[in-house]
Amino acid sequence: VHLTDAEKAAISGLWGKVNADGVGAEALGRLLVVYPWTQRFFEHFGDLSSSSAVMGNAKVKSHGKKVITAFADGLKHLDNLKGTFSALSELHCDKLHVDPENFKLLGNMIVIVLSHDLGKDFTPDAQSAFQKVVTGVATALGHKYH
């Protein structure tokens, strides 16, 4: 991902303002509600029968925290996303057989949640920078599929 110094600074500054665990839980929950076919990877999470069940599900929240922790790690290694996400790419490709398109969808959910949480601070330029990052992360996670 090619980011300018200004974009990197915006990402770093804004990321420090959010509750990362909350972003992860909300983003994963929204993914499962908005794109219900993604629930097939999480059937062992229990009740996912409605949006309120998904958003209140402790396992969704816990996994959302794992997801966003990995994403936050990527923010520390923006110049090496492929290397940073290599093991996760292998896991999701070889063992979990996740459609790599789902990584793009989740990235979009992260951007939506950041927009909501950051309000006016999430300017169009900030959105552009984060969109580049989530696209780069999705590409890195899909790397083992190619």
Swiss-Prot record:
The keyword Transmembrane helix does not apply. GO terms for biological process: hydrogen peroxide catabolic process. The modification N-acetylvaline is found at residue 1. The modification N6-acetyllysine is found at residues 59, 82, 144. Heme b binds at residues 63, 92. InterPro entries: Globin, Globin-like_sf, Globin/Proto, Hemoglobin_b, Hemoglobin_oxygen_transport. One of its GO terms (molecular function) is organic acid binding. GO terms for cellular component: blood microparticle; haptoglobin-hemoglobin complex; hemoglobin complex. Keywords: Acetylation, Heme, Iron, Metal-binding, Oxygen transport, S-nitrosylation, Transport. Residues 2-146 form the Globin domain. Red blood cells. The modification S-nitrosocysteine is found at residue 93. Involved in oxygen transport from the lung to the various peripheral tissues. Heterotetramer of two alpha chains and two beta chains. PANTHER family: HEMOGLOBIN FAMILY MEMBER, HEMOGLOBIN SUBUNIT BETA. Belongs to the globin family. This is Hemoglobin subunit beta. It comes from Ondatra zibethicus.
